[in-house]
Amino acid sequence: LGDVYKRQRYVHNDICFPAQIVIGEALAALESGKYDPDKVAIATGKYIGDCRLTHYAALLRKALDDAGYPQVPIITNDAEDAHNVHPGFKMNLKTAMQIAFGLPMIDALEELLRKIRPYELEPGSADAAFDKSIDAVIGGLRQGGIGGMKKGFKKAIASMLSVKYDRSKPRPTVLIVGEYLLNFHPGANRDMELYLENNGLEIIEARMTDVIRKTYFYQRSQQREYKVHRPLPTKLNNSISDAFFKLAHDATDKIAKAHPLYTPPCRMPELVQASDPIIHHTFDAGEGVLIPAEILHHAKRGCRAFVILQPFGCLPNHVVGRGISKRLKELYPDAQILPLDFDPDVSFANIENRLQMLIMNARKPRTS
């Protein structure tokens, strides 16, 4: 979090915590001296239009200009650039297809890592195999595009198969969901995953693929069910993108099933429609229905501990995170649902106290 504190002179401290993290880290990288500002670009995620995530590129542009890096371009994952703040790059179909194929593969490897690491017989072997696996997928992509990535993924699964483990005494499981930067950024969430694992739990994480795919799925559902008008090119793009994610899932499942611990994920249509009793599957604010959908999906499979990570003051995720807790408790009275708010000044002692209550309850023998 030092990057955030040191660079708050370029980002107002009332802006979203994820924005402070992203912009702070970008500036820290430039100030480190490792990169030539005249030969580097910064990539940042950007999607949906109901929260300040839409404005991260503009906030980053202002911070870079104020910090003395006006020449550094910004790359985002969409084609919108109304103010010409990041010229020189437009994501093409080939790049989008490679991303669509890569995400399910990374999700599969991370799932295997979380199922193996708490039970590994040789400390550090799971992390080492995972790092080797990621290198294999990236190397395959560089050498042979999507075909090369598939070959690299086969090598990755072989690496994960080489790790020895003993799952004869399974741990209680805990699902981590919430705003996706907090979910996947250990610096932002204070190494939440490692902390819970070190305290005797097995971690289940939401999938990054669903975070990206949901935009295309929602828009198609809104077009069909509510007759929302969108231009024909947008409709075609949504249909093609959603179909390509399905192909990517199919290819990933076909290769990953070689590992006995791999479980094919619940696909987007089935996953989100299961949340209809709480939030309709076409609702797309914040993380949309992914938070209740993931919780319901894993609750049906025996998980009873859930942590929802939220940036402080993030209204969309308060609605679909903390706001759904009461209804979920009605459906699963024995479930623990712990919403946690994060900002740069949050006390880890406060977070730890609340986590310890969840950990102690999760580790209690469950009564039938």
Please identify what each model-predicted range represents.
Residues 2-368:
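An N-terminal assembly and electron-transfer interface module characteristic of large anaerobic redox
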